[in-house]
Amino acid sequence: MEVKTFYNGNTMPQIGLGTFRVENDENCMESVKYAIEQGYRSIDTAKVYGNEEQVGAGIRAGFESTGIAREDLFITSKLYFEDFGRENVAAAYEASLSRLGLKYLDLYLVHWPGTNEAVMVDTWKGMEDLYKNNKVKNIGVSNFEPEHLEALLAQVSIKPVINQVEYHPYLTQHKLKLYLAAQHIVMESWSPLMNAQILNDETIKDIAQELGKSPAQVVLRWNVQHGVVTIPKSVTPNRISENFRIFDFELSDEQMTRIDGLNQDKRIGPDPKTFEG
C-alpha cells in the first residue's frame, strides 16, 4: 500500500473507498467491511452523504473479521454548510463521531468553500480548534480553488493538509495541481472514475487493452502516478477488489501523456466558486 505524507508528517493511504451516493443500509455496511477485508485501509464519508451510521457499522464488522486495530485505518468525514461557523464545528464533529461509533477521525474536511469568505475563515478556525485540542489527527478542505486557499491561508495559522476535489482525465485541474504542490497540500480525487463515464473513453480502453488491465485500473493508476490520493466508490465486491489492485503495474510516460491529453475541463459536480449546498 503506497501512502502520501502530509506536511505535518502524518500519512494517508493513496487509495481508499469512497461512499458518496451509497445508501445508509446493509449494502453500505457490507461494502465497507468487504473493502477492509480486501486490504483497503482508508474509508471516506461525509455528514451530507447520510450514511455515517452504516459506514461505522462496516468499520466495526471489518475490525471483527480481520483483527486489525483502529489505528490501522484512516477514516475521513466532512463538515457541511449547515454546520459552518467556528461555534458549530465541535458539535458537528462530535455528531459525526457518534454516528460512526468512533472516538476520533484521521481527517476532517470542510466539504465546500461556500461563497462567504468571512464564514469560510471563521469555520476553519473551528477546525483549527479541533486540531489544537487533539480531537482530530488532520484537518483539510474539499472543493477549494486556489483563490479560496489564498484567502484562507492569509488569515489562519494552520494550513489544510489536503484538498479533496473533482479530478479525472476530463478535468485534470492543472493550475490547481501546481498550486497545491507549491503549498505542500496533498491533492485527493473524489470522482476518479467520473461516475463510470470515463471508462468508455477509447483512449482509456486502448491503454487498458495494452496492459491487460481494466479501464478503471488504468484511470486509478494514472491518479496514483500523478501523486493524487484517490477514493473510488463502489458497492460491488469484484469492483472494490479490482480498484484496489493497481500497485502491480505502471503506466509508461507515453501512456500518461495520452491520458493527460484527454482533458476537457469538464465537471460532473457543482462549480466550487458558486455552490452553496
List the model feature ranges, each with a label:
Residues E23-I36, G85-L100, E147-E150, L171-T172:
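Short, acidic/polar
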Residues S42, Y104-L107, N138, I162:
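Residues at the N-termini of beta-strands
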Residues A69-D83, L107-P113, Y167:
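A short, structured active-site edge motif that brings together acidic residues
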